[in-house]
Every structure is written in C-alpha cells, then in structure tokens.
Amino acid sequence: MNTPQISLYEPGTILTVGSHHAKIIKYLTSGGFAQVYTAEISPPDPYSNANIACLKRVIVPHKQGLNTLRAEVDAMKLLRNNKHVVSYIDSHAARSVNGIAYEVFVLMEFCERGGLIDFMNTRLQNRLQESEILEIMSQTVQGITAMHALQPPLIHRDIKIENVLISHDGLYKVCDFGSVSGVIRPPRNTQEFNYVQHDILTNTTAQYRSPEMIDLYRGLPIDEKSDIWALGVFLYKICYYTTPFEKSGEAGILHARYQYPSFPQYSDRLKNLIRLMLMEAPSQRPNICQVLEEVSRLQNKPCPIRNFYLLRAMNQNANTQLAGEPSSTTYVPTQKFIPVQSLQSINQPPNMMPVTHVSTTPNLGTFPISINDNNKTEVTAHAGLQVGSHSNLTSPLMKTKSVPLSDEFASLYYKELHPFQKSQTFKSVESFQSPQRKSMPPLSLTPVNNDIFDRVSAINRPNNYVDSETQTIDNMAVPNLKLSPTITSKSLSSTKEIAAPDNINGSKIVRSLSSKLKKVITGESRGNSPIKSRQNTGDSIRSAFGKLRHGFTGNSVNNSRSASFDNNNVNGNGNNTNRRLVSSSTSSFPKFNSDTKRKEESDKNQRLEKRRSMPPSILSDFDQHERNNSRTGSRDYYRSHSPVKKTQASAKTTSKPTLIPDNGNVNINQEKKESIQRRVHNLLKSSDDPVTYKSASGYGKYTDIGTETSNRHSSVRITPITEEKFKKTLKDGVLDIKTKSNGKDKSRPPRPPPKPLHLRTEIQKIRNFSRLQSKKLPIERISSEATETIVDVNVDDLEADFRKRFPSKV
C-alpha cells in the first residue's frame, strides 16, 4: 500500500500525547512511515527533569501494523530509566484525520548532540582513537545488556551506527526498538519459513545480519547471539568506517570471511574482540556480559554490570537447595581458572574465577560472583550450598545452547595475542562438555561428595592390577603386585593357583628348575628326551610341556594350574603353602655362582657322553619314557594319530620289546604293539635310503624345461655334447635346436647373405675381424628351447675374466 500523504506539523502545533501536552518546536527528519519532531512537553520528564522531548509520529496504514508499534512501545517501557537506552516518556494512538489510517505518537528522550554517525562524520580525517572506540562500545553494550537481561530476553535485531544517539552530556544511547522481538525458533514448515524470512528482510539491515539470519536452512534460532554478531559489525565500522562484509556480501557473512584494513591501526586485543564476536557458529560467540567484561578490561576499568547469567544460576541453585530437591553434585574445579588481575605477586595466591559454561536460564549451579569497587572479583559460597552442574545449557525460551567465554576469549584476561596472530579459531561448543581436572581452586567451599573423588581417581588409575590393601583414598598408590615371569598370561586369565613347594630357598629353586629344564630339553639319555624322535607325532611336545609344568609347579602334570593372590597372608612365612606374589626391586632368584656353573658344566658333559654311548633306538627311548611317566598319554595319542594304516602282523617282525605298564593303569594289546613296532621299523628303513641331492641346474633365465618322466630329483637333464656334434655346430655356424614335445629337429630358415663391405659400419667390421681372429662362435642369445646344447666355452678365459671383474670374490 502506498504511503499516505500527510502534511508536516507546523511549529507551535499543540498535541495531546497520553498525559502530556506537546508543543511542536521543530521538524527534524522523516523516514518511511515516521516523522520526528522536537517538542516542549508539560509536565517535564520526571527521569531527566527536561521539558524538551522528541516526538515520533508514525503513520500505520492498517490495523495490523498497530501490533508492531505496540511491541516497540512495550519494549521501551521495559527499558525505561536506563541511561544507555533512549528513555520512554509517553505514547498515544488514534485514527488519522482522513480516517484511512492510524497515527501513533511516541514521546521519548531528546538527544541534543544527534546521532553517532554525525559524530563520526566530523572525524573523517582524524579517525577515532582506541579509547574513544572503547567508550562508545562500552556504553552501547550496556544498553543492549539491559535488553538481554530481561526474562525472556529481547533481541534488538537492528543494531547499527544509525541507531545510537548522543545525549547532551555525551552519553551514547541505543534507540529504534521497532525491530525488537523475542527469541525466534527455527521454522519447522514452509509457512513458518516464509514468515521468518519476510520478517528478517523487513526489520533488519543487510550488512548487520548474522549467518543464521541469512541461511535459515541451518536450523539455528535467532537469539542474543545474533545481536552479538551485529555488535561485532558495529565495532568494526566505528574502527574502520566500513563494514567487514562491504565487498564480499552475503558469501562473506555466511563463512565469516573478512580482513582488517591496514589503516588505522588498533591493538590486537581489540581485533581479537571483533573476531570473537564475528564467529560463524553462534555457540562460539561470547554472550553480552562477556563482551562488556572484555571491553572493561581493555579500558582498565571495572565492569559496570554484574554478570546476570551467573546471578541467575546462583539464585536457582540456592532455591533448589532450600526446597530440598536433589541436585547432582559435581567436581567444580574441572573448569579452567583464569586470574582476574594480570599483575599479582608470585608469593601471594591470586584471585581466581572459574569460567563456567552458563546459559541465560537459571539452570546451572555455580559460584555467586560479585565485582566490588576495587575491580576484584569476589567468589562467595553460602552456607550449605553445594555447587551443582547441569548438562542442559539452554538459552531462555528456545532451549538452545548459549556458551559463554571460550578458552581463547578467556585468555584475554591476562595476556595479549601475538601481533601476527589474527586468525585464531575458536573451539566448538562440544569441547566444553568434559574438561579435565587441573587443580583445586584456592576457595573455601562446602564439602563435595566423596563419590566425586572416587570417580576422578578411577579415571587416572593405572590399568595394571593394584591390590586393594595397597590402594588408599588419599594418594594414588603405585602397584606393588607384579606377576612372576614364569606365570603365563593364560594361567593368569584363568585365575588358578600355582602352589609353590615348601622349604625351598633361592639356590634350590635355581638348581631344580635348571636341571628340570635341561632334562626336558636335552635329556640325560636319548631315552629320557621326549622331543627327540625323528617323527614327532605331537605328543612328545605335549609331554615336554608337561615336564616343564611339573618342574615349575612341583606337582603332577595332570594337576590343575592356577594363580592365587592371597591378600591376607602378607607375613611371608616359609611354611605357607599359598604365597602372595610380591614384586621387589631385586630379582626373585639369586644369581648363579661359580660352583653352580661348574656343576652344570660337568653334568652337561656327562649327559653328552651317555648320549654318545647309547644306540639310537627310538623304541627304547619310547619305552623308557613311558616307564618314567605313564600319565603323559603319548602311547594312545601316537596310535590314534599315526599315518601308517593297520595291517596284518607279519612273520618277519623283528625284536618285540615289551612295554611294562605302571600300576596296571595301561593294558597293552599285542596286536597294537606289533603294529607300533612295524611302523617304527618302516620309518627306520625308509631313513636308510640314500639322500637325494637337488641342484640348481636348469634355472637359467631363458631355460624352459618340459615335464620329465624320470624319477630323478633334478629338475634339468643336460645331454652331454659329443665331438661330432660340436664340430658340426662349428661348421654350420648354427645351433641345432631340438624340441621335446615332438622329438623332431626344427630347421631354421637359410641364413641371409652377408652385408656388403661398403654398407657395413665400423663396429660390425671390428666384430667380424675379432671373430675371425678368435675363431669363436658369434655372440647370440640361446633360445629357451636350446637346453640340450652346450656352447663351446673357454673355461680359462672365463676364469680370467671373472678374476678381473670380481677381484674381491677370488
């Protein structure tokens, strides 16, 4: 609908606005549907005691537009009497004179020094100093803080240079609340999407829009973090007199890509503040309280406003404790602690403040923090107040994340960025979920549950086993229980006992174990060695390990193995059957002395002499081993796994040694015994066959050998060359090639005539001359089929050539 043509008020016109009478003094400006005048009011404004006010006249084409004006008026009423917000005085709405529209009159505070943009235009040559910029930013942020502190919060959505005014006493005030709204949740259907998109395009300025405003498909709410983005653009513009996305446009906004001009130059901390406020992800931007705190630090002034997020969290937690509702207690010092004052004595403990992750909802327990006149943060704890932590950090109304100051932003408390560090990135919000515990804060707090310390100690506890008696709750004990090297991991996992023999000292253990081990491995005689047979059926190895276990445990081979860790018997008496395995700084066994070494050497020599004197009889070895230990089960295993099939007993069977069982446990079958003997003799007979040697002949690069029908193991058969064949080869100058597939000779095509002398090259002439001199065969590659023909080779020449080429190998 077209804007209705309404004439301007003449100076001196008297209007009634609510309970005030306004007399028009001067017309100031107009834009869109609004006209702005200065007027003299009566009675005067009780807040400022001024009788000069600003009269805003708005033409509303239809009744639906009255809701927008009503929202603006309500917002100004909520922010009344804030020194950094243009104060509301009175308002009135009525039908226009022509009756086709509505007129809304709003009386508000008059700022005599005009707008911020007018002040900036006076400093085009002499740009603003950093101190001036920080002062403008501080007062503007205080005005926005008043909006975000409301419950539910108000979002300005149109923060820009043109909407900041300067009062007669030099205060900067935020104005134009026509775009104010609550938190806008992400649209869930097409209708909501179109409505939100139209609302953003109507009530926001393009260069100040945040990425979540431009790209609604991201599904992010439009909340206080959108105002933080606009404040970042605002700060950039008062520094450089242009917006950061003037050239790149929406593409730069969506990915937060911009550059800092080289002139004018400002501190890195100020640039870093801009960078933090212009983070692409809303969760990585600081909240309004953190922005104000950082600006105050840059000014070296105390923060003028207390962090209402922390106050709400403290009050909510206190109410929860008073009501007797259970609250989860957590170990609070897992957060990073940042010193408030940058210059402090080393010997004096600094004042620390935990940077906790809070939201706009009073749903997070933390310390009540107050800032006194000395710019020191005081952390107080009420009696009986337990510090709680809630995982759901949600912003008001929309239950969305609102993560405060991150690690990079918090670093501005006590240090500045490197001059070249201009593109430092933020950690995502997920990085704040489970911070690691660093140290206890120097604070006097109420007790925390002991379960917290148990959980923390369990996290840092080593993986190896620690006895319950050696572990205390005060300090992390070093495991004093180390497993013996003779215990395998399999036995440990089965948690069975290893019974140690009684009254065995270190030297006896050494001697017994070493003798047992050597008996098993080498054997005092061939008959005693269970792993020396020529055909190992598997039971010999099994019996060898049975011997090893018998030597280590002192029990029978068939006894069950177990590892017992007796936590009660710690006196270390020698009579205890089950001993606790305790590690020490020294070895469990003493070192070998010279006597032991000499004894072992003599035993070794005796065993070798015995083995040399005894005949190599596998049957005698087998029988002797079965007599010594009848529980190995090697005979049954050998019979069941032998590859030799059972046959009739032959009359030619040789000597039949008798196997004598122990204690009648094994009944010997005569037929099976003969079968065993026959198989063993067959093996011995086969071992007497001459050893076949395999050569590497025939493995040349160009040698192709067909399948041989002979039983020879050599893969290549070379036919000896005869003198007649050699002379024939020299005469013809061609190698006769015979194929093994058909047995017929293949005749080669006739040799081409020699090349005329005038066409031959020098190299060919030299080669032909050398051939004539040496009378050798031409140098040709022997085909792969010429395996039965040997070329004449001078061995002496080859040997001389080899010595010349490889002198080190001769």
Curated annotation (Swiss-Prot):
Changing K56A: Abolishes protein kinase activity. It catalyses: L-seryl-[protein] + ATP = O-phospho-L-seryl-[protein] + ADP + H(+); L-threonyl-[protein] + ATP = O-phospho-L-threonyl-[protein] + ADP + H(+). Coiled coil: none annotated. InterPro entries: Kinase-like_dom_sf, Prot_kinase_dom, Ser/Thr_kinase_AS. Pfam families: Pkinase (PF00069). The keyword Nucleotide-binding applies. Residues 594-612, 622-639, 733-748 have a biased composition (Basic and acidic residues). Residues 22-298 form the Protein kinase domain. The modification Phosphothreonine is found at T553. Keywords: ATP-binding, Cytoplasm, Cytoskeleton, Kinase, Nucleotide-binding, Phosphoprotein, Serine/threonine-protein kinase, Transferase. ATP binds at L28, T29, S30, G31, G32, F33, A34, Q35, V36, K56. Residues 567-588, 645-658 have a biased composition (Low complexity). Gene3D superfamilies: Transferase(Phosphotransferase) domain 1. Its EC number is 2.7.11.1. Residues 743-756 are annotated as: Interaction with SH3 domain of ABP1. GO terms for biological process: actin cortical patch assembly; actin filament organization; negative regulation of actin cortical patch assembly; negative regulation of clathrin-dependent endocytosis; negative regulation of protein-containing complex assembly. Transmembrane segments: none annotated. It is found in: Cytoplasm, Cytoskeleton, Actin patch. Present with 1323 molecules/cell in log phase SD medium. Interacts with ABP1, which is required for proper actin patch localization. Protein kinase involved in the regulation of actin cytoskeleton organization and endocytosis. Phosphorylates PAN1 which disrupts the interaction between PAN1 and END3, and between PAN1 and SLA1. Phosphorylates SCD5. Preferentially, phosphorylates substrates on threonine residues in a [L/I/V/M]-x-x-[Q/N/T/S]-x-T-G motif. This is Actin-regulating kinase PRK1. It comes from Saccharomyces cerevisiae (strain ATCC 204508 / S288c). The gene is PRK1.
